[in-house]
Every structure is written in C-alpha cells, then in structure tokens.
C-alpha cells in the first residue's frame, strides 16, 4: 500500500487542476472559488499563493514561459513573476454565469478547456494563433481531458452525466470525430 503524505494545508474552497511545471520542478494548482493559484516547491516546501481577480478553472504551460489559463472571463495568459493576466478571448461572453472548468494542453501546444455553468456547455480548443474552436456541445460538466499515449484518441469526462467519452483525435489538425461513450457509470453505485 502507498504511503500518502499531506504536503500542505492550502485550505482550498475548490482545489483543482494540479499541474507539474517541469521547468521549475514545482507544483501549481488552482482554487477556483477562492480565486487563487498555488505554487509549491516539494523539495524546499516553499509555498506561494497568488490572488487572482477571477475564477481560474485550469492552467497550462506555455513554451515561451508563463501559463495559459481558462477562467470565468475566457482564455488568458498569466505571468507568475508579476501576477499579470492578459486576456485573449471569451467564447462564452454571452453567458454571464458560465466559467471554464477543466482542461489540458495537447502534445503540439493547443489548449483545450470545457465550459461550465450554463444549461448546455462546450469543449473548446485555443490554437497557437489564438483562434478558438468549439468542438463539442451539449455537455454538463466537461472534466478530465486527456489523450491516449499514441495520440489517436481524446478522452474526457462529463461528470454530471457519469460518462467518459472517447473521440478519434487527429494530432496534426487537432480535430476530433466519432464520439463514443467509453464508460457509462450512471447506473453504478
């Protein structure tokens, strides 16, 4: 059995999206409802908290440094050194109760994130040229986005529907197609 240790009492209201920053060898995560981003150096146990003016659902690493993030105000860049946020675009600006929830960066650097808070939510992709594509609709709470090791499939969970979907994924173009329900746990305890 694994020995699990409590590293830090961050007291999050809604802690999500742990992200290992291999560049700094540090762990980042968000407290969505607390409007905070946490940074922890597991070797020195130096802990930093950044107070953010918006709810951040997820962070992703940028090749040029800093982070891309999905927030209640859409997609943005964030520089922890200055705590500066530069907003890019908000594909859900017409939905004031909507925010972004979970997401991930694919192998070629596109940032994927799902919206949450409306009756029908979506899965979006932010491309390198900063254009945004809506790739899936009719979702409740898109969560847990990831890819198969060979990058042939994209997976994500729709938490409220208790389903994990699998799409065929084209790495070169970032297109998804042929959704199947890979796991349906709606009737399971």
Regions found by a protein language model. Name each.
Residues 9-24, 53-68, 94-111, 136-153, ...:
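Beta-rich, blade/repeat-based domains predominating
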Residues 22, 27-32, 68-73, 111-117, ...:
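Conserved beta-strand positions in repeat-built beta-propeller and related beta-rich domains
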Residues 36-38, 74-76, 121-124, 163-165:
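A short loop-to-beta-strand structural motif that recurs across blades of beta-propeller domains
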Residues 167-175:
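Short loop/turn segments immediately following beta-strands, especially the blade-tip
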Residues 39-40, 77-86:
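Surface-exposed loop/turn elements that mediate protein-protein interactions on large endomembrane-trafficking
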Residues 26-51, 72-75:
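Beta-propeller domains
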Residues 3-9, 45-51, 86-93, 130-137, ...:
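A short beta-strand motif characteristic of beta-propeller blades
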Residues 83-137:
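Hydrophobic alpha-helical segments and helix pairs
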């Amino acid at each position: 059995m694994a020995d699990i240790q409590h590293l830090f009492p961050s007291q999050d209201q809604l802690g999500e999206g742990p992200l290992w920053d291999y560049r700094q060898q540090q762990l980042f995560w968000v407290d969505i409802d607390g409007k905070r981003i946490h940074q922890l150096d597991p070797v020195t146990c130096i802990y930093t908290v950044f107070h953010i003016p918006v709810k951040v659902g997820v962070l992703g690493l940028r090749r040029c440094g800093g982070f891309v993030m999905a927030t209640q105000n859409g997609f943005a860049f964030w520089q922890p050194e200055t705590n500066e946020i530069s907003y890019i675009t908000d594909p859900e600006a017409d939905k004031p109760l909507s925010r972004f929830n979970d997401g991930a960066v694919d192998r070629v650097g596109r940032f994927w994130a799902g919206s949450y808070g409306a009756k029908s939510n979506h899965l979006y992709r932010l491309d390198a040229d900063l254009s945004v594509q809506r790739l899936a609709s009719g979702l409740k709470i898109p969560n847990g986005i990831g890819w198969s090791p060979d990058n042939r499939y994209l997976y994500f969970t729709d938490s409220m529907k208790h389903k994990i979907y699998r799409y065929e994924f084209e790495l070169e173009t970032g297109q998804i197609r042929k959704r199947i329900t890979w796991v349906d746990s709606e009737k399971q305890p």
